[in-house]
Design a protein with these regions (language model features):
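Structural signature of Gram-negative outer-membrane beta-barrels, strongest in the C-terminal barrel
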Residues: 212-214, 224-230, 236, 263-386, ...
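Outer membrane beta-barrel strand-and-loop segments of large Gram-negative receptors
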Residues: 214-216, 263-267, 273, 353, ...
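Conserved C-terminal beta-signal and adjacent last beta-strands/turns
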Residues: 51, 104-106, 362, 458-551
Length: 551
């Protein structure tokens, strides 16, 4: 990665399709003259990068990869656990990996071609196998449960310079996100062991799949009209294939077999947008960025259209002070659903349809910034409203659902509101550098089908968020860095009391049975404990003949 930038407000017209933020990641292009590489080994993960020329001064490549090995480090402890009970074999599984690759090729004086690929996977689960044997009988049981999620994206880009003032990029992409869960239980019985006479077997498997696959094409133009106007314009097309969720159930017992799939109908949609924006240098003190983003979605015979104005300005005041302000309207056709009641990631992407309207937002922000020597200070406030947000209805879940409701029946749409302020201080040069950032914010949600229609704190509402980062070079070869983060605890719903209720006669094996029922609080009425973490690092550099070594 050569550069990462995040835009949380004041979105230029070239960005669209999301309400919250835009993360722009630029990959290294690879060295066209000589080979370089680096490798890092830490306590829980390793990574490596290599780059160099394919044809000197004409083409280059870059490859990088990383993987955690918590699963490998845990093996000795698991082996010791298994040795305590020879009939039990437990095998936990947790790791993630990702890989990046890029090829850069000069086609001529005015043309370049780029091909890049990324893929990553997180896997979490547990396998357990238990065996019982007494000489004449043998029984085996096994359990396998877990979840995994995978991402991949491939992009091909052609860059062409039409003139000293005009150049373009034509890009073709393919991306995919897949989320799986599994719960498998198997039992084998040999009552006349070692003979297989009378062998019994039973197997249950519950598998859940959700995903999204996109194919897209985009063209962008950058036009330096004159020293005061820099114009960007372009268009994009994306074909979405959504698999909102399919549950596959398998059950085998003796000669009885059941294999059925519930849900899984794909939803196809086409997204088209065009944009134009102008960076206008009005005078030496005032700079403005204005534009329009025109977005369209075609799905299930329905069409949605949105013309989104974007505006931003920066005005230099006396004394090195700068005032900035922005306004942006956004629309999002791809909706992220998160099951708030599960600690592990269960993010599901679902589309806007004829029944599910696209999410929209309006955001305004303003702030002041000042630079004093190596120091930079800023303060900014924002206010944002959101409509047609999506959430699970209370009690609804996509995982292993056996009812006849479609996934659309389990979604509620509502509104949201967020506002707050951010303080930031940074030292960018010198032997010691770093920054301090503090955010004070509020975030609310309101749905007719949730919390009795009353407004409540969003799950990720975080009143206070503080980050302190610093690094210093003691010498040319020894450096120290540290980062401390603090945040208000997550908003959660908890049971306030429990009570017994009677069950109807015939529902239980004895009449008069009772069930214990929890009475939950209002939605997100409680807070988890505040979260804080301190990371420190001490690095030693040793220069070798052909390479540098860090520890």
């Amino acid at each position: 990665i050569s550069n990462v930038s995040i835009t949380k407000g004041g979105f230029p017209a070239r960005y669209g399709g999301r309400l919250s933020s835009v993360l722009e990641v630029n990959m290294k292009e690879g060295n066209m003259k000589e080979f370089h590489g680096d490798a890092t080994v830490s306590l829980i993960a390793s990574k490596m990068t290599v780059e160099g020329p394919l044809i000197k001064d004409k083409s280059s490549f870059m490859l990088s990869a990383r993987r955690t090995y918590i699963d490998v480090l845990a093996k000795p402890f698991i082996t010791n656990l298994n040795n305590q009970d020879p009939n039990l074999n437990v095998s936990p599984r947790y790791y993630f990996y990702d890989m990046n690759g890029k090829v850069n090729y000069k086609l001529g004086q005015y043309d370049r071609f780029y091909l890049s690929h990324f893929q990553g996977k997180d896997d979490f689960g547990l396998r357990s196998r238990d065996t019982y044997e007494n000489g004449t009988e043998r029984y085996e049981s096994s359990i396998d449960f877990g979840l995994d999620w995978r991402n991949s994206i491939t992009a091909a880009r052609w860059n062409h310079q039409w003139s000293p003032k005009l150049f373009s990029n034509v890009t073709a992409t393919r991306s995919q996100y897949v989320f799986n869960t599994r719960a498998i239980s198997e039992e084998l019985g040999y009552p006349n062991y070692p003979d297989t006479l009378g062998m019994s077997d039973e197997r249950f498997a519950g598998l859940y799949f959700s995903g999204i696959e996109d194919y897209g094409a985009r063209i962008d133009f950058d036009f330096a009209l004159n020293p005061r106007h820099y114009i960007r314009y372009g268009a994009n097309y994306t074909n979405h294939t959504f698999s909102p969720g399919a549950t596959n159930l398998e059950f085998q017992s003796g000669g009885f077999n059941l294999d059925t799939t519930i849900g899984g109908d794909a939803v196809y949609s086409d997204e088209v947008y065009a944009f134009i924006e102008d960076e206008w240098k009005v005078n030496e003190n005032l700079k403005m960025n204005g534009g329009l983003h025109f977005a369209n979605l075609f799905v299930q015979g329905e069409s949605y259209h949105s013309l989104q104005p974007r505006f931003g300005m920066n005005y230099s005041l006396p004394g090195g002070l700068a005032f900035k302000a922005s306004y942006a309207e956004m629309m999002q056709f791809v909706n992220l659903l998160t099951n708030e009641g599960i600690g592990l990631p269960t993010d599901l992407w679902v589309p806007s349809t004829a029944n599910i309207k696209p999410q929209t937002s309006q955001q305004i922000a303003a702030g002041l910034a000042k630079s004093v020597g190596p120091y930079k200070f800023s303060v900014e406030g924002y206010y944002k409203t959101m409509d047609n947000l999506v959430s699970y209805k209370e009690g609804a879940s996509f995982l292993f659902s056996l009812d006849n409701d479609t996934w659309e029946d389990k979604i509620s749409q509502g509104s949201g509101e967020s506002y707050g302020m951010e303080l930031f201080a940074q030292r960018k040069s010198g032997r010691t550098t770093g920054w301090i950032g503090y955010t004070l914010s509020w975030s609310y949600r309101q749905f007719d089908d949730i919390n009795g229609g009353e407004r409540y704190f969003f799950t990720y509402d975080r009143r206070h968020d503080l980050s302190v980062v610093a690094s210093t070079d003691f010498t040319d070869n020894i450096s120290f860095s540290g980062a401390w983060v603090y945040g208000t605890g997550r908003a959660v719903t908890l049971p306030e009391y429990s009570y017994y209720t009677g069950l109807p006669d015939g529902l239980s094996w004895w009449d008069g049975a009772r069930a214990l029922v929890d009475r939950p609080s209002d939605k997100n009425a409680y807070r988890m404990s505040p979260y804080h973490r301190l990371d420190i690092s001490l690095s030693f550099k040793k220069e070798k003949k052909n390479y540098d070594r860090w520890w």
